[in-house]
Each structure stands twice: as structure tokens, then as C-alpha cells.
């Protein structure tokens, strides 16, 4: 749509999500896989690894933050340039019981334990934010 050319590879632990992706993008159906990156070892690397919205539902036990940080660490391991995860923000004005809300300051603090080149964007929706973790210093990367 915007003329951006990329080679896309999609994974999800939910077979229904993979089936929906294959149906929506039949020309790329061979690039969508059911896979759990926290349980299975992935050997491929990617320029960017992006996760959008999978961490918004509350777990039955209070493990959202632990799971999220394990996922982010693994995403960073698989990336060459950087990783990004979008999350629901604790700064929302309309919380509900089913959603887990992440405090951006806590996510930043936890991410800083394994990534020093971090950016948070909390400007695009009132209840979401994305944390970006880059492998290299952004100042040197842009130059």
C-alpha cells in the first residue's frame, strides 16, 4: 500500500490467528506458522521482530510482566536491528477487567536490564504504547 518492500514472516501460538492470516493474505500463506518462541528454539534471525497486542489479556495468574519480559528478551535475541512490542497502558482512562495494563515506567525499567537502546512511544493511542529495543545506539545507527 505504501510502497514498502519487505519479506514478512508471521508466527503465533494461536492456530486460529495463523489461519486468519493465511486467509487474508493467501499469496503469503507459506510465511505464516504456528510457533511458540518461548517453548521452541528458533534459529533464524530477522532485521526486526514486532509483536502487536498479544499481551493485553490478563493471565489467570499474575504472570503478565514476567511473560512479557521473557518474550521481549527472546525477540531481541532473534533480531539484528531491533524489536518492538505494543501494550495497553496503565494510563488509560477506561480500564476493564479482562485487560492487563502495563505501567510504561516499569516496562522501561525492566527492559533496561537487557537492552540499553530503548525508545517508548505513547503518542499514537490514548491507551497503548510501544517499547522499542535496538541492538545498536540509535545515534550511530542513523548516521
Residues covered by each model-derived region:
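Short conserved loop adjoining the S-adenosyl-L-methionine
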Residues: 39-44, 59
Amino acid at each position: 500500500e505504501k510502497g514498502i518492500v519487505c519479506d514478512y514472516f508471521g508466527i503465533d501460538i494461536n492456530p486460529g490467528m495463523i489461519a486468519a492470516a493465511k486467509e487474508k493474505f493467501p499469496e503469503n500463506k507459506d510465511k505464516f506458522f504456528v510457533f511458540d518462541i518461548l517453548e521452541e528454539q528458533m534459529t533464524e534471525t530477522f532485521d526486526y521482530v514486532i509483536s502487536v497486542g498479544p499481551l493485553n489479556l490478563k493471565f489467570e495468574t499474575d504472570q503478565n510482566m514476567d511473560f512479557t519480559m521473557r518474550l521481549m528478551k527472546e525477540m531481541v535475541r532473534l533480531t539484528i536491528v531491533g524489536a518492538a512490542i505494543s501494550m495497553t497502558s496503565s494510563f488509560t482512562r477506561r480500564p476493564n477487567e479482562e485487560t492487563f495494563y502495563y505501567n510504561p515506567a516499569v516496562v522501561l525499567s525492566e527492559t533496561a536490564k537487557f537492552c540499553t537502546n530503548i525508545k517508548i512511544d505513547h503518542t499514537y493511542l490514548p491507551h497503548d504504547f510501544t517499547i522499542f529495543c535496538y541492538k545498536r545506539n540509535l545515534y550511530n545507527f542513523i548516521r
